[in-house]
């Protein structure tokens, strides 16, 4: 069905709430791919949004600073900040009930809308179409040469995000991380998880 207004729906929007890690980005991508395949017109209506949460928090006495990207944190932290306590958030489960309430109080500020752009169709097809495996290999190879800052969406400072930017600056990090943890290293024949088990045994 071709939708022209969200008033035709029972809900005004679909909000994705995932962990702020690579696997969370993969889930976002899968949902966007599903909507794009079955109901592409909904993407043009900004029906799909995402709520971002901090990946790092720094506290000192009554002061709290939240960071949504590694680069933003590194820029602020520099060579160290005396007296500041740093907490890393692996996922939503790391947050306390009080922090969850805090996020929902600021939900308007933490919501990012996904926008359709001229590269949306090609980007989603590249990332998910099984017929594009060879193109995907080239895509991943090209991105291994990029700096981390080039493969990062400035969450926390953007309210709208082109879907192609999401694919090429966020989702790609899941694919690169998945390769690292899924393919055995040529030096020892082990995957990272297996190597950690071996390390813990001795």
Language-model regions, residue ranges each:
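Conserved phosphate-chemistry cores used by DNA topoisomerases
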Residues: 1-202
